[in-house]
UniProtKB/Swiss-Prot annotation:
<feature type="binding site">
    <location>
        <position position="43"/>
    </location>
    <ligand>
        <name>substrate</name>
    </ligand>
</feature>
<dbReference type="GO" id="GO:0005524">
    <property type="term" value="F:ATP binding"/>
</dbReference>
<keyword id="KW-0067">ATP-binding</keyword>
<comment type="pathway">
    <text>Cofactor biosynthesis; thiamine diphosphate biosynthesis; 4-methyl-5-(2-phosphoethyl)-thiazole from 5-(2-hydroxyethyl)-4-methylthiazole: step 1/1.</text>
</comment>
<dbReference type="GO" id="GO:0004417">
    <property type="term" value="F:hydroxyethylthiazole kinase activity"/>
</dbReference>
<keyword id="KW-0547">Nucleotide-binding</keyword>
<protein>
    <recommendedName>
        <fullName>Hydroxyethylthiazole kinase</fullName>
        <ecNumber>2.7.1.50</ecNumber>
    </recommendedName>
</protein>
<feature type="binding site">
    <location>
        <position position="192"/>
    </location>
    <ligand>
        <name>substrate</name>
    </ligand>
</feature>
<keyword id="KW-0784">Thiamine biosynthesis</keyword>
<dbReference type="Pfam" id="PF02110">
    <property type="entry name" value="HK"/>
</dbReference>
<keyword id="KW-0460">Magnesium</keyword>
<keyword id="KW-0479">Metal-binding</keyword>
<dbReference type="InterPro" id="IPR029056">
    <property type="entry name" value="Ribokinase-like"/>
</dbReference>
<comment type="similarity">
    <text>Belongs to the Thz kinase family.</text>
</comment>
<dbReference type="GO" id="GO:0009228">
    <property type="term" value="P:thiamine biosynthetic process"/>
</dbReference>
<dbReference type="GO" id="GO:0009229">
    <property type="term" value="P:thiamine diphosphate biosynthetic process"/>
</dbReference>
<dbReference type="InterPro" id="IPR000417">
    <property type="entry name" value="Hyethyz_kinase"/>
</dbReference>
């Protein structure tokens, strides 16, 4: 828990600039989430300015939600540039497994090297070649033990930190694995909440190593969701309260409400 508190403190002190190449559906949502937490967002995907923008950024988040051939070129190029410049990269392979194009582009980006891969059970399964576990951008049902094993297997296969999100979130770098129990089911009734997590992971990975960064993002967001639900029981007001609690969350709140533990297979 101490590393989560320290990571949040660093984000607010350093206000990292997070370069998001993300989808049209969530640009506003994720930018506001980053601002509420204390980071600085930029949403830019033009291929012509990628190198300049990435030089300015502290981390890069790639989200394939509204993918097309132009976005693919920008995303692959951004991954290559960020790696050359030593900037951490978060990949959110939205809808991988739903279409061959999404799966292929996600694997193409992964092959260049990313620091964090965050997706639901179906998306991560698809990237490992397991089909039939995705419906659109949503994951079909699975067991917690399956999710834990999938997270560790994917981390080892892709040599990166992997988060598999769900009722329980699992994070692994192939050696250590954390389970995060924070969150609320109403998140599933608001579009873009998974994309928010990817963006926040970008803020955290700018200030600490990937395993701690990803775990910190999931715990922070999960607590914010729980606290938001205490004050707003319906999706519209809940969405607004999420921003409020990303802004309000602090050391005392994390110490009181964090539900995270290291697990073994």
């Amino acid at each position: 828990m101490k590393f989560i508190i320290e990571a949040l403190k660093r984000v607010r002190e350093r206000r990292p600039l997070v370069h998001n190449i993300t989808n049209f559906v969530v640009m506003n949502t994720t930018a506001n989430a980053l601002l509420a937490l204390g980071a600085s967002p930029v949403m830019a995907h033009a291929e012509e300015e990628l190198e300049e923008m990435i030089r300015l950024a502290d981390a890069v988040v790639i989200n394939i939600g509204t993918l097309d051939s132009g976005w693919r070129r920008s995303m692959v190029k951004a991954t290559e540039i960020a790696n050359e410049l030593g900037k951490p990269i978060v990949l959110d392979p939205v809808g991988a497994g739903a279409t061959k194009f999404r799966t292929r582009v996600s694997l193409e980006i992964l092959s260049r090297g990313v620091d964090v891969l965050k997706g639901n059970f179906g998306e991560i399964s698809a990237l490992l070649g397991e089909e039939g576990k995705t419906r659109g951008v949503d994951s079909l049902e699975y067991g917690e033990e399956e999710a834990k094993k999938l997270t560790m297997n994917a981390a080892r296969e892709f040599n990166t930190t992997v988060a598999v999100t769900g009722a329980v979130d699992y994070v692994s770098d192939g050696r250590r694995t954390f389970a995060v129990y924070n969150g609320h089911e109403l998140l599933g009734r608001v579009t873009g909440t998974g994309c928010m997590v990817a963006a926040l992971t970008g803020a955290f990975v700018a200030v600490t190593e990937p395993l701690k960064a990803t775990t910190s993002a999931l715990v922070t967001f999960g607590i914010a969701a729980e606290k938001a639900y205490e004050e707003a029981k319906y999706p519209g007001s809940f969405h607004v309260k999420l921003y409020d609690w990303l802004y309000r969350i602090n050391e005392n709140v994390i110490r009181t409400y964090a539900k995270v533990r290291e697990v073994e297979l």
